[in-house]
A protein has these predicted regions:
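PIN/NYN-family metal-dependent endoribonuclease catalytic core
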Residues: 1-2
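Enriched for short, Lys/Arg-rich terminal
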Residues: 5-19, 23, 36, 42-43, ...
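Blade/loop signatures of beta-propeller domains
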Residues: 30-31
């Protein structure tokens, strides 16, 4: 739910960020561990999650299962 709130925040404040998030999600669905946004695996309490850069400050944080993509956050730095 937090990630949806993040997404709604961007829809209200910066359409360019929404476009970038959508591009990153599309790319992540195709190639989860390489591509746009400099994908990197997260460590410690976020082990199993990956991040991609939306901007210098904000990250798309996600996990991939066999058949789905879980978006954990798309605002701030994990």
């Amino acid at each position: 739910e937090e990630s949806w709130d993040d997404y709604l925040y961007w829809q209200e404040t910066d359409k360019r960020i929404v476009k970038k998030i959508n591009e990153l999600i599309k790319d992540t669905r195709r190639t989860p561990f390489e591509g746009k946004g400099k994908p990197e695996p997260l460590k410690h309490n976020l082990s199993g999650f990956w991040s991609r850069r939306i901007t210098e400050e904000h990250r798309l944080v996600y996990a991939v299962t066999d058949d789905s993509l879980l978006i954990a956050a798309c605002r701030y730095h994990y």
